[in-house]
A protein has these predicted regions:
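Active-site/ligand-binding-proximal alpha/beta "capping" segment
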Residues: 163, 168-205
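Short acidic/His/Gly/Ser-rich catalytic and metal-binding motifs that mark active-site loops
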Residues: 134-136, 234-239
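A C-terminal functional module that forms or caps the active site or interfaces directly
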Residues: 193-237
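Glycine- and other small-residue-rich loops at beta-strand/loop junctions that grip anionic moieties
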Residues: 83, 151, 155, 184-188, ...
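Metabolite-binding pocket within alpha/beta catalytic cores that recognizes anionic/polar moieties
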Residues: 1-154
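His/Asp/Glu-rich mid-to-C-terminal helical/loop segments that flank catalytic regions of hydrolases
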Residues: 236-250
């Protein structure tokens, strides 16, 4: 894996001028946020050595290098999912490459189903913690000591410092924010009513099919992480809302 990381980062290095310490992953239906980035380079995933190519509608498949809010950033416009058939190492490979390029802080976003009965469609949820329900762990296999420890701690997977800053910004701008636990499942089928109820019982506030593997790998490399979910469908009513992918993208 190290050779692949080096090959990919070597290809991208000429596009990364100066210090880019912030990485961003734009999830399903959130690719349009890429328009807020002052783009210097937009590199298709298919052009980057060893990168997978997203097969999901709503994921454009470009690595954006530029500035956002006065900060130099590297942003993924579209991510990879375990349900697409990729291994966990392939799903999380771009995070490894970001780290090799100097990224120290990772911002992840996703579209999620609201499990908490107080959540409404359109709510923004700061991820304070996650529940890993994927069948494969991204760190399974021989550990690469150059990247991180064999048994990384997850006591603070999501930075309390960044969560506090986000809450302060939300209060200042009068943007209501939820804060909760994200449950990550394999997919691609959406959850049954019984599964939603079970996730609620074990402490989940929102559910989706991404984010958790990327954050685990980022923390393995001691990157500071912040996560945000957009609640695109709700299970607050007794009758489960019929969910489809087009709805989740909207």
């Amino acid at each position: 894996m190290l050779d692949k990381i080096r090959e990919s980062s070597k290809y991208l290095a000429p596009f990364v001028k100066g210090e880019h310490t912030i990485g961003i992953i734009l999830g399903t239906g959130l690719g349009e946020l890429g328009k807020s980035i002052e783009i210097e380079h937009a590199i298709p995933y298919m052009a980057i050595p060893n990168f997978p190519v997203s097969t999901v509608q709503g994921h454009r498949g470009e690595l954006l290098i530029g500035s956002f809010g006065g900060k130099k950033v590297i942003a993924m416009q579209g991510r990879f999912h375990y349900y697409e058939g990729y291994s966990m190492k392939e799903v999380t490979f771009p995070v490894r490459v970001m780290h090799a390029l100097g990224v120290k802080t990772l911002f992840v976003s996703n579209a999620a189903g609201g499990v908490n009965t107080n959540y409404l469609v359109g709510d923004l949820m700061i991820i304070r913690d996650h529940i890993n329900l994927f069948p494969e762990h991204p760190l399974r296999g021989k550990n690469i000591d150059e990247l991180g420890p064999r048994f990384p701690g997850m006591a603070e997977a999501y930075s309390k410092r960044l969560i506090q800053l986000a809450e302060e910004a939300g209060n200042k701008l009068n943007i209501p924010l939820q804060k909760g636990v994200y449950a990550g499942l394999q997919g691609p089928s959406f959850e049954t009513p019984a599964e939603y109820n079970w996730i609620r019982v074990i402490g989940g506030d929102a559910v989706g099919m991404s984010t958790v593997p990327e954050v685990i790998v980022a923390r393995h490399m001691n990157m500071e992480c912040f996560g945000m979910s957009v609640i695109t469908n709700s299970t607050a009513s007794e009758e489960l809302i019929k969910t489809n992918h087009a709805e989740v993208q909207d």
